[in-house]
C-alpha cells in the first residue's frame, strides 16, 4: 500500500473528487427528468430467488424463462454484470446488450457502486453456476453521492462504524446479521411470554420519582408543568402498580436510562425486559429464565452451547445456584464466615479488594461489595446468585429463614450480570421503612440510593398478591448470542462522544 493510500488528507481529497463527479452525474439525471422515481414495485427478493431456484439447472431456467423484478444497491460493477444487494442478500444482474436500449446502456456506464437500481428480466445460470438476472429493463432509482468504503480501506475503524452505522450495515453482512438476531430474540421473548398469558404493557418513560433500581437518573424539566422530571431508570414500580390493579402477569420491553459510565458492558440508554407474575416466587423465575434462555440459544444457534470469545457457555445444563455469602467463600477459600460476618473485617476486605467504601455501609452492603470485586468476574458458566442482603434489595421480600437476606437472584454469565429478579416485597409498612433507609443513605452520599415513593406505598396498601418479578438486559443477552465483545456492537446507534 502506498503512502498516498495511507495519507488521510490524500484520501479525503480523493473522496471529494469522487463526490464532485457523482454530483455531476446526478445533475445529468435531473436534466432527463425525475432523478428519484418512486413508481417501481419490487416483486422478488435476492435471497428468496437464490433459495427457491438453487436446484434449477442452466437449461431448466432457460426453458422456464422465469420473470423477476428485483431492486437493490450496486455492490460490484464489472460493466457486463453487476451485483446488487437488498435486505435479504445479493444476486447478479447481467447487462445484455441485445435486450437493453442504447440509451439504457449509456446510463448503465455512468452508474457507481452504492447506486440503487431496479431490474427486470428472467433468471439464468452462468457457466460457473451462479444464478443471475438477464435484464430486459433496468433503471436508476437513487444516485449515491458518497462512495462506499472500498475493499482496500474498508470500514475498519470501530468508532467510525458506530458513528456511521448506516454505512456499516451496507458493507458488513455480519453486522446486519447481528441486528436480525436481535430482532428475532425480542420477537421470541414476546411470544414466549404471551403464550404464558403475560400481557404486554407500556409504562411512563418520564417520571417524577426515579425508582425501581439503584442508579443515577437523567434529569429534565417539564416546561408546561414547571416541574423537574427524570428519564426512567426502570419500569418496576409502575409494573407492580399494574399487578395491584389486577393485571397479574405483565411485561414490558423498552428503554431505560442511567446517567452513568460508558464501557463495553454499559450504555446510558439500553433495552430491558421486565416481567411480573402473581402467585409465583423467585425460584419460579429461575426455572422460567432457564427455559427461555435455552429456547433462545436453540433459535439463534441451533444448539444450547453458546460460543463466546474463547469460551463456550452451556445453556443446556442446569444453571448453578449459589448464595452471595457462599459464593464469596467458594471462590475465596482464604476468607472465613467469621470474616464476612464481622463488619470491621468485611470493611477492610472490601477496601483491599478495591471497592469504593464510603464508611456508612452496613454489613450486607459490604458483603455485596466484596462479591462484586472478588467473585463476579469468575462466574463464567451460568450462575444464579441468590440471597442478596436486604439492605441492597429495598424492593425484595425478606427470606423466611434468614431475615437478613432476601428472596432474590442475579444471573451471571461470562462474569456479567444478565438478569435480576426477586420475590417482590408486598408488605406496605416494610416497604415504607426501607424507602426511609434509602433516603438516609442518599443523604449520607449514596447517589444510587432510591427516593421515597409515597404513591407506590399507597398502591401496596391496597394489597398486592405474592409476586415474582425479573429484569433481563436485552443488549447483554444479544451480546452473548451473537458473540459480540461490546454492547455497542448490538445497539444500532450507541452513544458516542462528540467528534473534535
Curated annotation (Swiss-Prot):
Its cofactor is Mg(2+). Keywords: Aminoacyl-tRNA synthetase, ATP-binding, Cytoplasm, Ligase, Magnesium, Metal-binding, Nucleotide-binding, Protein biosynthesis. GO terms for cellular component: cytosol. Coiled coil: none annotated. It holds the Pfam family tRNA_anti-codon. It is an enzyme of class 6 (ligase). Belongs to the class-II aminoacyl-tRNA synthetase family. PANTHER family: LYSINE--TRNA LIGASE, CHLOROPLASTIC_MITOCHONDRIAL (PTHR42918:SF15), LYSYL-TRNA SYNTHETASE (PTHR42918). This is Lysine--tRNA ligase. The lineage of its organism: Bacteria, Pseudomonadati, Pseudomonadota, Gammaproteobacteria, Pseudomonadales. The gene is lysS.
